[in-house]
Design a protein with these regions (language model features):
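Catalytic active-site module of serine/aspartate enzymes centered on a nucleophile-bearing elbow/loop
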Residues: 415-418, 424-453
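Alpha/beta-hydrolase active-site loop
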Residues: 234-256
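N-terminal cap/lid segment of alpha/beta-hydrolase-fold proteins
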Residues: 132-173
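Short beta-strand/loop motif that positions the catalytic acidic residue
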Residues: 374, 380-382
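Accessory cap/linker subdomain of secreted extracellular hydrolases
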Residues: 223, 286-373
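Primarily recognizes the serine-hydrolase "nucleophile elbow" in alpha/beta-hydrolase
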Residues: 248-312
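Short solvent-exposed beta->alpha transition segments
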Residues: 34, 45, 49-94
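Cap/lid segment of the alpha/beta-hydrolase catalytic domain
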Residues: 181-241, 310-313, 421-432
Length: 453
């Protein structure tokens, strides 16, 4: 199987799956799920030629029919006899479409993760632990007795209404309010990844401290297929993906009676943090009180994607020939993006998950420079163990904004990209396999910043 495939598939989403227009659950008749089920059925029957018929060239070379036969021969000894396929769902990570089919064996239940490339060929396959939906584990600093949650709609009456949750302190307001803006990819309102829900941690922690927090579903999660089918997709930029909805969320808070209209803040994580300066300028008429950047990227997105993939492929100490080939393809995509002309803006083709207009819109955008135009308090937060948005990005913010009145910087030595604490070499396992709440010190620093302004 493809080395590091689990890394590539499970863990690219938090910081940079960019425009992954894909919802998590789809109907069983989905074409790729049907293909995945047929692949597994062929394995079960021992028809390895049929199982491999949809393999891409690399899979055929490294895991062709003979290798599949060897692999399947070992399954009964380790897992017990195969019993049946059950539920199926879809996912998308790192540019690959993924079908997950739950398989019951005599000894254990696992998910078959079948990976498809752009030509709908099977580019990878493995069995991974079948994880039930994780029950939310509130951090110790969250006290549900001190706040309540209500369902709201961001952008109600518009073309893209989004369901959200407002965590609001109990008692007499008005309370300061905070809007949470997602990172890359089709995030839910909690920024769920594996057993972790960092936005829910932040919302519950701050609501316990007297601050109302609004989090909402990302447009690309709810309307992914509609966005792609829209004739305007070719002109889609971060404005439609992120900025417009963030400002709608601010408007919703301003219209909520128990919220202090003059003390509404916006927090952006990862891509959301990178876009905070643009959100601030686009929302000047809303008189937003201040802004918080959590792991805000300053480097160009395409180059960052290449750097992340290089890091992930090297996690096991070496980069295989196949992985080097994949990196070469990514480099070519980066070069294509950098060679775009303004006349390419109307093209609908995807280049690293987004149309040319998306990349042209971000060309030349350097967040710290744009932040110099924002005359509001800002808090810049960064984890030292974040390999996706690095301390180099943090230093870029400091170089430009350091010493400016009203701008604060906080670096957390043990924090990863989700601002949970850990030790050792940072890897994606911390996101998908290990539960870790946003660190108490991070939530405390955010609360102090908001409450003093």
């Amino acid at each position: 199987m493809l080395k590091n495939l689990a890394v590539l598939l499970l863990f690219c989403s938090a910081a940079l799956s960019l425009l992954s227009f894909q919802q998590g659950e789809v109907a069983p008749e989905d074409e790729l799920i049907v293909k995945a089920r047929a692949f597994l059925k062929a394995l079960e029957k021992g028809d390895f030629e049929a199982a491999a018929k949809d393999f891409d060239a690399t899979m055929m070379k490294v895991s062709g029919p003979e290798k599949l036969a060897e692999f399947w021969k070992q399954v009964p000894e380790k897992l017990g006899s195969f019993k049946k396929q059950t539920a199926a769902r879809r996912d998308q990570f790192g540019g690959y479409e993924v079908a997950l089919v739950t398989c019951e064996f005599e000894k254990v239940t696992l998910d078959a993760r079948v990976v498809f490339d752009k030509e709908k060929k099977i580019a990878g396959f493995q069995f991974v632990p079948s994880l039930p939906p994780a029950k939310y584990e509130p951090p110790a600093y969250a006290d549900p007795a001190k706040f309540e949650e209500r369902e709201v709609t961001v952008g109600a009456g518009g073309d893209w209404p989004l369901q959200g949750t407002l965590a609001i302190p109990k008692g007499v307001g008005p309370f300061p309010g905070l809007v949470l803006v997602h990172g890359s990819g089709p995030n839910d309102r909690d920024e769920t990844i594996g057993p972790n829900q960092p936005f829910r941690d932040v919302a519950w922690g701050l609501a316990s401290r007297g601050i109302a927090v609004l989090r909402y579903e990302k447009r690309t999660r709810i309307y992914g297929p509609k966005l792609v089918a829209d004739p305007k997709f070719a002109s889609l930029t971060v404005k439609e993906e992120t900025i417009d909805d963030a400002l709608e969320a601010v408007r919703l808070l301003k219209s909520t009676g128990s919220i202090d209209r003059k003390r509404i803040f916006v927090l952006g994580h990862s891509l959301g943090g990178m876009l905070i300066p643009r959100i601030a300028l686009a929302g000047k008429d809303l008189d937003i009180a201040g802004f918080i950047v959590m792991a805000g990227l300053t480097s160009p997105l395409p180059e960052t994607y290449l750097r992340q993939m290089t890091y992930l492929f090297a996690l096991d100490g070496e980069t295989s020939a196949d992985e080097k080939k994949q990196l070469d393809e990514i480099k070519k995509d980066v070069d294509r993006i950098n060679a775009l002309r303004e006349s390419d803006a109307g093209k609908a083709e995807k280049m690293i998950f987004a149309p040319p207009a998306y990349w042209l819109d971000l060309r030349g955008y350097y967040p710290p420079d744009v932040a110099m135009k924002v005359n509001r308090p800002m808090l810049i937060l960064q984890g030292s163990r974040d390999y996706q948005v690095t301390t180099e990005d943090f230093e870029n913010w400091k170089k430009t904004l350091g010493g400016r009145p009203g701008v604060e910087f906080k670096l957390y030595p043990k924090a990863n990209h989700l601002f949970a604490e850990g030790q050792g070499l940072p890897s994606p396992d911390e996101y998908s396999l290990v539960h870790g709440s946003v660190a108490d010190t991070v939530v405390s620093d955010i609360a102090l910043f908001i409450l003093k302004h």
